Regions:
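Short beta-strand/loop motif that positions the catalytic acidic residue
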Residues: 225-227, 232-234, 238
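Hydrolase active-site cap/lid region
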Residues: 157-212
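Catalytic histidine-centered segment of alpha/beta-hydrolase-like enzymes
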Residues: 266-276
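The serine-hydrolase catalytic nucleophile loop
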Residues: 79-93
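An N-terminal hydrophobic leader/cap segment in hydrolases
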Residues: 1-49
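Alpha/beta-hydrolase active-site loop
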Residues: 117-138
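Short alpha-helix in the alpha/beta-hydrolase fold that links the catalytic acid
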Residues: 89, 219, 228, 242-251
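Conserved alpha/beta-hydrolase
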Residues: 90-113
C-alpha cells in the first residue's frame, strides 16, 4: 500500500506528455502559450537543491506588464501532476492579474528528483524555499501561495510554519485535511476496505522509510498555527477529496483573515474549469482585500 500510494508510475519525465495534454484539456492553448513564451526567453527554468538534498525544478515568468506587477504567485500542482497541469492558473495570474509567477515541480514529479510523493508534508519546505527564490528573482513584497489538491494541502501545511514577511496570502483549492483522511477515502472508494490494518501498516512503513506518517501529514494541525490570510476553495460535487474537507480545513484556521468560496457543481480540481470568471474574480477580490489589511 505504501508503494502503491507514494511510488506510483509512470511519474516524472516519463509522464510529461500526458500532463501537457491535460493542461490543454483544462484550458485550450496552454502548452502553445507556454512553448511560445519559452521560445522567446520570457518563461525560464531554474533548479535548486531542495529538502533532503534532491534537485528540484521550477519555471518562472514575469507579469505581462512587469513594471506594474501586482505581486508574485507560487502555483503548486497536485498528486501525480507537474508544473504543466495548472497552466490555467499561471495564465490567470500572469495575463489577467498581472502577477509574476513561479510554478514548481514537487519532488517525484515532473523534472524534479525525489524518491516518493510526499503528500505535501515535506513538499512544504521546498515551496517555502521557492518563495524565497521568487522573492529574489522578482523583488516583490507580496507573494501568494496558490495550490490545487495535493498542492493545496502543501500550501496549507506551509501556512503553519514561520513564513517570511513577504508571503502575504494563501489560496487553497480542494486540499485534503490530512494524508490519512485522503488515503482512507481512496482505500474505501477503490478497494472497499477499512483503514485497519492496511492503511495503518502503510503509514508505519512510510514513517520508517521516509520519516513521516500519514496522520502527521495534516493540513488541519498546521492550519491551527496559521496566521496568514487564506482563501479556501472547493467544488461541492467533489467526491475525490470529499467536500466536507473544506469545512474541516476552514474551521481549523482560527487566527488571521479567511474567506471561503464554493464552486457549485464542480468535481475535484474543477472549480476554475466550471466557473473561470467567478474563480478569477474571487481570487482577485481576496488578494485586493489582503492588501488593505
Amino acid at each position: 500500500m505504501c508503494n502503491y500510494a507514494l511510488k506510483f508510475n509512470p511519474h516524472g519525465e516519463a509522464d510529461i506528455e500526458r500532463t501537457r495534454e491535460k493542461a490543454d484539456s483544462l484550458l485550450p492553448g496552454s502548452t502553445a502559450w507556454y512553448d511560445g513564451l519559452k521560445a522567446q526567453g520570457i518563461l525560464k527554468d531554474t533548479t535548486i537543491v531542495g529538502y533532503r538534498d534532491f534537485k528540484v525544478h521550477a519555471c518562472y515568468v514575469p507579469a505581462a506588464n512587469p513594471a506594474k506587477a501586482n505581486g508574485t504567485a507560487i502555483v503548486v500542482h497536485g498528486y501525480g501532476d507537474n508544473h504543466f497541469v495548472f497552466l490555467y492558473l499561471v495564465r490567470m495570474y500572469r495575463d489577467n492579474l498581472n502577477y509574476n509567477v513561479l510554478f514548481p515541480d514537487l519532488q517525484y514529479h515532473g523534472y524534479s528528483e525525489g524518491d516518493h510523493a510526499q503528500m505535501g508534508w515535506y513538499d512544504r519546505f521546498d515551496v517555502e524555499k521557492w518563495a524565497e527564490v521568487a522573492h529574489g528573482i522578482f523583488g516583490d513584497d507580496f507573494v501568494v501561495l496558490h495550490g490545487v489538491s495535493m498542492g493545496a494541502a502543501t500550501v496549507m501545511m506551509a501556512s503553519g510554519d514561520e513564513l517570511p514577511p513577504y508571503v502575504k496570502a494563501v489560496v487553497e483549492d480542494c486540499g485534503y485535511s490530512s494524508a490519512w483522511d485522503q488515503f482512507k477515502v481512496n482505500l474505501k472508494q477503490s478497494f472497499h476496505l477499512p483503514p485497519f490494518p492496511i492503511l495503518t501498516s502503510a503509514s508505519m512503513v512510510s514513517k520508517s522509510r521516509y520519516g513521516w506518517s500519514f496522520k502527521e501529514a495534516s493540513s488541519v494541525e498546521q492550519l491551527k498555527k496559521s496566521t496568514v490570510p487564506m482563501l479556501f476553495i472547493h467544488g461541492d460535487a467533489d467526491d475525490f477529496v470529499p467536500f466536507e474537507h473544506l469545512q474541516k480545513n476552514y474551521d481549523a484556521k482560527t487566527t488571521g483573515y479567511k474567506e471561503m468560496w464554493v464552486g457549485e457543481g464542480a468535481v475535484h480540481a474543477n472549480s476554475y474549469a466550471k466557473h473561470p470568471e467567478e474563480y478569477e474574480a474571487h481570487v482577485k477580490a481576496f488578494l485586493e482585500k489582503v492588501k488593505t489589511l
